[in-house]
């Protein structure tokens, strides 16, 4: 898997974006061809699919965590299906406590704390495992653009700062698909990290199914220390902003590609940078799980989702799913 940072031209069009447009046209054609040839299967339970239209972090994992807690509170049995990004997974696997991020992906390790999780790179491989687990609900993390299975309920996550970037498809822009079709079909749209009351113009037609959500810290961190922040996630800027809004003194930061698998040399370099800044290392939970027993001196910021319309979410989820 190619791992990329989010280039500036994905947010604001420039000559590079236009030069890449022919490849985006090919990407679009291949997507249409894939969808037209697909024969979607019915999974053995109701499916809630959480996805986005663009590359980069939009808060999907936090939405899945929120749904898992919601279903657990209602005593509804569920299984989470995750894509195992950045792992060496070769076949669908039910995650257990001993699995590492390299084996099943960072998101899988995190989500396993909330319930049963299947990691897979092929949606069709999960059916035998689902038949064993017999859930009432299947929460699918990502796979929104996957045409090979039926979705009963879809949630589209949108980052309030990036929105849909420059409006171009990969690689000229960040879009996996043009948003209108996905937004029209969505049962709910989450506008994530939205602290303003104003709704972006592109989302005003969908106000009746729009939920404003914030990603907020869920653990206590010593605010008297200096911190050097690093991350290898889809939206590192949001992580750094969350740290500052929390009141931490950030003396420096380093960005790695999304789903980055850290080497010992990276860790040594990070400790060196922290020492230069007289600071303690701080990172995300997705990064923290990759260090196993080596992360004792790295502080982790845990986050969770806070939403403005929990009643709307409850009504929609339990009415349809």
Swiss-Prot record:
Enzyme class: transferase
Catalytic activity: a lipid A disaccharide + ATP = a lipid IVA + ADP + H(+)
Alphabetized InterPro entries for the sequence: LpxK, P-loop_NTPase
Residues engaged in binding ATP: 54-61
Domain of life: Bacteria
MF-aspect GO terms: ATP binding; tetraacyldisaccharide 4'-kinase activity
A Pfam match: LpxK
Keywords (A to Z) from UniProt: ATP-binding, Kinase, Lipid A biosynthesis, Lipid biosynthesis, Lipid metabolism, Nucleotide-binding, Transferase
Enzyme Commission number(s): 2.7.1.130
Gene Ontology CC annotation, any one: plasma membrane
Alphabetical GO biological process terms: lipid A biosynthetic process; lipopolysaccharide core region biosynthetic process
Pathway: Glycolipid biosynthesis; lipid IV(A) biosynthesis; lipid IV(A) from (3R)-3-hydroxytetradecanoyl-[acyl-carrier-protein] and UDP-N-acetyl-alpha-D-glucosamine: step 6/6
PANTHER family: TETRAACYLDISACCHARIDE 4'-KINASE (PTHR42724), TETRAACYLDISACCHARIDE 4'-KINASE, MITOCHONDRIAL-RELATED (PTHR42724:SF1)
Role summary: Transfers the gamma-phosphate of ATP to the 4'-position of a tetraacyldisaccharide 1-phosphate intermediate (termed DS-1-P) to form tetraacyldisaccharide 1,4'-bis-phosphate (lipid IVA).
Family: Belongs to the LpxK family.
NCBIfam families per record: lpxK
Protein name stated in the entry: Tetraacyldisaccharide 4'-kinase
Annotated organism of origin: Rickettsia africae (strain ESF-5)
């Amino acid at each position: 898997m190619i791992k990329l940072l989010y280039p500036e031209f994905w947010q604001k069009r420039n000559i590079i974006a236009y030069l890449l447009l022919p490849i985006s046209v090919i990407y679009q054609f291949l997507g249409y061809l894939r969808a037209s040839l697909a024969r979607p299967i019915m999974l053995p339970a109701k499916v809630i699919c959480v996805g986005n239209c663009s590359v980069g972090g939009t808060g999907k994992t936090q939405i899945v965590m929120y749904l898992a807690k919601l279903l657990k509170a209602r005593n509804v049995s569920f299984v989470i299906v995750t894509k195992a990004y950045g792992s060496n997974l070769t076949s669908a696997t039910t995650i257990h406590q001993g699995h590492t991020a390299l084996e099943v992906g960072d998101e899988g390790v995190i989500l396993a704390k909330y319930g049963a999780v299947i990691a897979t790179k092929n949606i069709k491989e999960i059916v035998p495992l689902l038949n064993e687990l017999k859930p009432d609900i299947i929460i699918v993390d990502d796979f929104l653009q996957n045409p090979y299975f039926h979705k009963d309920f879809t949630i589209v996550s949108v980052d309030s700062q990036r929105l849909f970037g420059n409006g171009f498809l990969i690689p000229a822009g960040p879009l996996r698909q043009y948003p209108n079709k996905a937004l029209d079909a969505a049962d709910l749209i989450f506008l994530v990290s939205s602290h303003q009351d104003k709704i972006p113009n592109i989302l005003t037609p969908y106000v009746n199914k729009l939920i404003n959500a914030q990603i907020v810290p869920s653990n206590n961190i010593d605010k008297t220390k200096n911190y050097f922040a690093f991350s290898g996630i889809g939206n590192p800027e949001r992580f750094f902003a969350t740290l500052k809004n929390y009141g931490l003194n950030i003396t420096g930061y380093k960005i790695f590609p999304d789903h980055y698998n850290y080497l010992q040399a990276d860790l040594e370099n990070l400790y060196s940078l922290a020492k230069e800044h007289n600071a303690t290392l701080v990172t995300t939970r997705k990064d923290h799980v990759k260090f196993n027993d080596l992360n004792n001196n790295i502080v982790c910021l845990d986050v969770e989702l806070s939403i403005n319309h929990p009643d709307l979410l409850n009504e929609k989820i339990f009415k349809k799913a």
